[in-house]
Design a protein with these regions (language model features):
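Transmembrane beta-strands of outer-membrane beta-barrel pores
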Residues: 50-54, 68-70, 79-83, 92, ...
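Repeated loop/turn-to-beta-strand initiation elements of outer-membrane beta-barrel proteins
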Residues: 70-74, 106-111, 157-161, 204-211, ...
C-alpha cells in the first residue's frame, strides 16, 4: 500500500487529472432531454435572520445560493453572542461556510470551505488571593477550526469513480487564573485525508447490487504546550493511517423486499515513535464491520435487524499521562426494530444492546481542567418506543419513551449504574398547523433520576432528582417574512443533569429562556 505522506503529496495532481478528463463545457450536462438548458436563467435566492434571547444572547445569519446551467454556488455567514447567566461572562462565535458544485453529463466536481471561531471570557472564581489584586483576572479561551475539501466524480457506464481531498485545522488557546498564578495552554492540529472510491450498480440474477470499494489515506499532526509556574512543557505528535473499506448492498425485490447491507473496514494507524509500546511495532490495526437487514412483511409493517463493531482512536489531545495516546475504544452493538403505520398513525419499537471497551471520555473531576481517559468495560441495554397520530387535519401528537440500563461489565464495580446516564427518558409533543402560515408546537420532556459522578463504587447514596421541562414554539409567515417566538423550560423548573461530583460540581440549568426571531426569504 502506498505510503500516506506520498499519497497526500500527489493528491492535488490526482484531482486535477480527474477534472481534466471531463469535458470543459458544462452545457452538455446542463441540458434536459429536449436539449433545452435546465436553467437558462440564473436563480439567486437566500435568507436573512436575526434572533434575540434572554441572557444577553443575540445572533444574525445570512445565506445566499445561486444555481444556473448545472452550476451551484452557496455561502453563509453567522454570528452569535451570549452573556449566559454568569455575571461578566461573554461567548462570541463567528462562522462561515461556502461551496460550489458543477454537474456534467459525465460526472460532477466541486469544493467546500468553512471556518468557525469562538471566544470565551469569564471572571476567575473567587479566591482569597484575588482580594489582594485591584481587579479580578479573567479566564480566556479561544477556539478556531477551518475545513476545506474538493472532490471529483466521474460516471463510466454503471461505474462511479471518485476522489476527495479533505483538510481540517484546529487551534485552541486557553488562559486560566489560579492561586499560584496563571497557566496557559495551546493546541494546534492539522488533519488531511485522501479518499478514492469506486462504486458499481448492477443486477445479479434479479438481485440489485450496489458495491463500493475505497481507501482512506490520512495524515495527522498535533502540537501542544503548557506554561505555568514551574511546569512548562511542549509536545508534538504525528500519526499516519491507511484504511481499506468495502460495502455491499443487496436488494432482492419481491413481496417482502428483503434488503441486506454488509460493510467492512480495516485500518492501520502508524504511531509516533514516542508513543510506541516497548515490546510492539509502530503500527496499530483496527477492524470494523456492519451487517444490516430489513423485510417489508406487510404494506404497513417492516422489520429490521443490525449488528456492528466500530472503533474510535484517541487524537492524543489532552490526557493525564503526559500527552500519551489512550487505548482505542471498541463498540459492539446489536439492534432489532419494527415499524407499523402510515401517514395518519404510526408506531415503532426498537430493542438495542451496546458494549463498550476502553470508552474514551472527558473526565471533569480530574484537576481543574479535566483530562481525557478510558473507562472500564460497560454495557447499555434498552428499549425505545415512538408513536405518532394525526388527531385532526391540523393537529398531530408525537411521543417517545426510552428505557436504558447502563452498567459496568466484567469489572470490580460490576453492577452499579453508570453515573450521569438517565434510566428513563420520555417526551410528548403536540403540533398545530393553522391557517395563513401559522404553526405551533408544545412539548414536555421528563428525565428519570440518575446517579452522580464519579461514583464508580456506588458510595454516593444521593441521586440527581428527576425533572420535567416544557418548551414551545409559535411561527407566523407573512409573505417573505417568518416570525418566531420560542421558549424553553417555560415552567422555570430548577434542574440539572451535569454533576461530576457527589452532590458537588453541580452545573445548574434552571432558567426560563425566551427567544424571538425574524427571517426574510428572497
Amino acid at each position: 500500500m502506498m505510503p500516506v505522506p506520498l499519497a497526500l503529496t500527489i493528491a492535488t495532481r490526482t484531482l486535477l487529472l480527474c477534472a481534466l478528463a471531463m469535458p470543459a463545457c458544462a452545457q452538455e450536462g446542463g441540458k434536459g432531454e429536449d436539449g433545452v438548458p435546465a436553467a437558462s436563467q440564473g436563480a439567486l435566492h437566500g435568507d436573512l435572520s436575526s434572533e434575540l434571547a434572554q441572557g444577553g444572547q443575540h445572533s444574525v445569519r445570512g445565506a445566499l445560493a445561486y444555481d444556473r446551467d448545472g452550476m451551484s454556488l452557496d455561502a453563509s455567514m453567522d454570528e452569535l453572542r451570549n452573556g449566559n447567566y454568569r455575571d461578566g461572562s461573554v461567548f462570541h462565535q463567528r462562522g462561515f461556510n461556502g461551496g460550489a458544485e458543477w454537474k456534467l453529463r459525465q460526472g460532477r466536481f466541486g469544493f467546500t470551505v468553512d471556518e468557525l471561531k469562538q471566544d470565551t471570557r469569564y471572571p476567575a472564581p473567587e479566591a482569597p488571593y484575588l482580594a489582594m489584586l485591584a481587579a479580578r483576572p479573567e479566564d480566556l479561551y479561544r477556539y478556531e477550526v477551518r475545513r476545506a475539501s474538493a472532490f471529483v466524480q466521474r460516471y463510466v457506464g454503471s461505474f462511479e469513480l471518485g476522489v476527495e481531498l479533505s483538510q481540517r485545522e484546529k487551534r485552541a488557546d486557553a488562559l486560566y487564573a489560579g492561586e499560584e498564578g496563571s497557566a496557559e495552554s495551546s493546541y494546534r492540529s492539522r488533519w488531511r485525508q485522501l479518499s478514492p472510491r469506486v462504486r458499481h450498480y448492477g443486477k445479479l440474477g434479479g438481485v440489485g447490487t450496489d458495491t463500493e470499494v475505497g481507501l482512506d489515506l490520512t495524515q495527522w499532526e498535533r502540537r501542544s504546550g503548557r506554561a505555568a509556574l514551574g511546569r512548562d512543557g511542549n509536545a508534538q505528535r504525528r500519526q499516519n493511517a491507511r484504511a481499506l473499506l468495502l460495502r455491499e448492498e443487496l436488494a432482492f425485490g419481491g413481496v417482502v423486499a428483503p434488503r441486506l447491507l454488509l460493510g467492512l473496514r480495516h485500518e492501520q494507524i502508524q504511531l509516533d515513535p514516542a508513543d510506541m509500546p516497548a515490546d510492539g511495532g509502530n503500527w496499530e490495526n483496527q477492524n470494523a464491520w456492519d451487517v444490516q437487514g430489513s423485510l417489508q412483511l406487510r404494506p404497513q409493517l417492516s422489520v429490521y435487524a443490525k449488528a456492528a463493531r466500530s472503533y474510535h482512536i484517541d487524537d492524543d489531545g489532552y490526557t493525564s499521562a503526559g500527552y500519551r495516546p489512550l487505548t482505542g475504544q471498541e463498540r459492539r452493538e446489536t439492534e432489532l426494530g419494527a415499524t407499523y403505520g402510515d401517514a395518519v398513525r404510526s408506531a415503532s419499537v426498537r430493542v438495542f444492546s451496546e458494549r463498550l471497551s476502553n470508552q474514551i471520555v472527558f473526565d471533569q473531576s480530574l484537576g481543574q481542567l479535566g483530562f481525557v481517559g478510558n473507562l472500564e468495560p460497560s454495557r447499555r441495554d434498552g428499549i425505545a418506543v415512538e408513536a405518532s397520530v394525526a388527531l385532526a387535519r391540523d393537529w398531530r401528537l408525537d411521543g417517545q419513551v426510552r428505557q436504558v440500563h447502563a452498567r459496568y461489565d466484567e469489572y470490580a464495580y460490576d453492577g452499579p449504574d453508570i453515573a450521569l446516564v438517565p434510566k428513563t427518558l420520555a417526551s410528548v409533543r403536540l403540533y398545530w398547523a393553522g391557517p395563513r402560515g401559522a404553526s405551533a408546537d408544545l412539548g414536555v420532556q421528563w428525565l428519570r433520576a440518575l446517579r452522580y459522578g464519579p461514583d464508580f463504587d456506588n458510595s454516593c447514596l444521593a441521586q440527581v432528582p428527576a425533572f420535567a421541562t416544557v418548551d414551545g414554539r409559535y411561527v407566523r409567515k407573512l409573505g417573505a417574512w417568518e416570525l418566531e417566538l420560542a421558549g424553553s423550560n417555560l415552567a422555570n423548573r430548577r434542574h440539572y443533569g451535569d454533576a461530576p461530583g457527589c452532590r458537588s460540581s453541580i452545573y445548574q440549568n434552571d432558567k426560563r429562556q425566551l427567544r424571538v426571531s425574524a427571517r426574510y426569504h428572497f
